[in-house]
Amino acid sequence: MRQYLDLCQRIVNEGCWIENKRTGKRCLTVINADLTYDVANNRFPIITTRKSYWKAAIAEFLGYIRGYDNAADFRKLGAKTWDANANENQVWLNNPHRKGTDDMGRVYGVQGRAWRKPNGETVDQLRKIVNNLSRGIDDRGEILTFLNPGEFDLGCLRPCMYNHTFSLLGDTLYLTSYQRSCDVPLGLNFNQIQVFTFLALMAQITGKKAGQAYHKIVNAHIYEDQLELMRDVQLKREPFPSPKLEINPDIKTLEDLETWVTMDDFNVVGYQCHEPIKYPFSV
């Protein structure tokens, strides 16, 4: 929690104003942020200086694991995070590749589970990683990437957190996640939860011990219409201790994650937080 607040304070103190053409807003921006999450000791990195809707964050990433490409499927899991980008992004609404209401196109999990090869076949990146790690194999290329520049025009949004690299040291599994762009007041807590939970789940289904998760952000920013709430409200609050994440131990395979797992299989224990803060969201 403290490293999150330190990053927020750094942006407020040192950030540079940059105009964002996609949203038409200015962003207070810093370059390069490194965060570390202690998955081994289950120090769940959830925001406590405002209420965090952690179930939606996990639901969204579960949708990526399943390769979903439709906002309606994410809503069924408990995440409304794709409603706006699928249905209110004017560039995407005008895109001839859009298939209709709630269609997201070839983004995130679609790339992770069905990356297109030149011959028309697809690559299931996640399946390969799970298979290798389950056998104790780390080929130094256990990489899940959502970034496919050749298909940017086939999706409603380029991936922000775009790369997840797994590493094995003995029987301990580590994760390094890379993010090109981060809306810190709104998006970062989702991303923190997702990085932490992804490592915890992958360790569980491959029979490994979870180590540390490393989260590397290139462009970390606060939008101009978020700044006052961050500076004058959230940063004035004292954080509470980190809670713990409980995951149903019956989740043992990738197939489990693909089929029957719901948000009822996750629980956060000991979560204390301040009142919610409604930050503006930029499409």
UniProtKB/Swiss-Prot annotation:
Catalytic residues of the enzyme: C160 (nucleophile)
Pathway this chain belongs to: Pyrimidine metabolism; dTTP biosynthesis
EC number: 2.1.1.45
Annotated coiled-coil segments of the chain: none
Catalytic activity: dUMP + (6R)-5,10-methylene-5,6,7,8-tetrahydrofolate = 7,8-dihydrofolate + dTMP
Main localization of the protein described in the UniProt heading: cytoplasm
Subcellular location, record wording: Cytoplasm
Function of the protein: Catalyzes the reductive methylation of 2'-deoxyuridine-5'-monophosphate (dUMP) to 2'-deoxythymidine-5'-monophosphate (dTMP) while utilizing 5,10-methylenetetrahydrofolate (mTHF) as the methyl donor and reductant in the reaction, yielding dihydrofolate (DHF) as a by-product. This enzymatic reaction provides an intracellular de novo source of dTMP, an essential precursor for DNA biosynthesis.
PANTHER family: THYMIDYLATE SYNTHASE (PTHR11548:SF9), THYMIDYLATE SYNTHASE 1 (PTHR11548)
Official protein name in the record: Thymidylate synthase
Organism: Mannheimia succiniciproducens (strain KCTC 0769BP / MBEL55E)
